[in-house]
Amino acid sequence: MYAIIATGGKQYKVAEGDIIKVEKLGVEAGATVSFDQVLVLNNGQVVVGNPTVAGASVSATVVEEGKNKKVIVYRYKRKSGYHKKNGHRQSYTKVKIDKINA
């Protein structure tokens, strides 16, 4: 059984027991969160939502919050001596999928 959920502007294919990194949710570790935007549900038969599956949700437990590896952004313009170097670390929340509620 799997589901495709939408959170943080992205879509994730999840099954029970999976651990995934999603965009920062702003809740502490150990808290339970529910994802209500279920786009596709497969429990032997595929159900496609329009745009979401009515009455379906996915419950998960927050494992941790953190930051990804640093991404270096480097810009320059030739012949003018313009150089700019920035770094960015995107925040994430790691969640463990507990149950897919159909």
From Swiss-Prot:
GO MF term list: rRNA binding; structural constituent of ribosome
Function statement: This protein binds to 23S rRNA in the presence of protein L20.
CC terms in the record's Gene Ontology section: cytoplasm; ribonucleoprotein complex; ribosome
Keyword line: Ribonucleoprotein, Ribosomal protein, RNA-binding, rRNA-binding
UniProt record similarity statement: Belongs to the bacterial ribosomal protein bL21 family.
Protein name, per record: Large ribosomal subunit protein bL21
Listed InterPro entries: bL21-like, bL21-like_sf, Ribosomal_bL21
An example Gene Ontology biological process: translation
Pfam name, any one: Ribosomal_L21p
Superkingdom of origin: Bacteria
Subunit structure: Part of the 50S ribosomal subunit. Contacts protein L20.
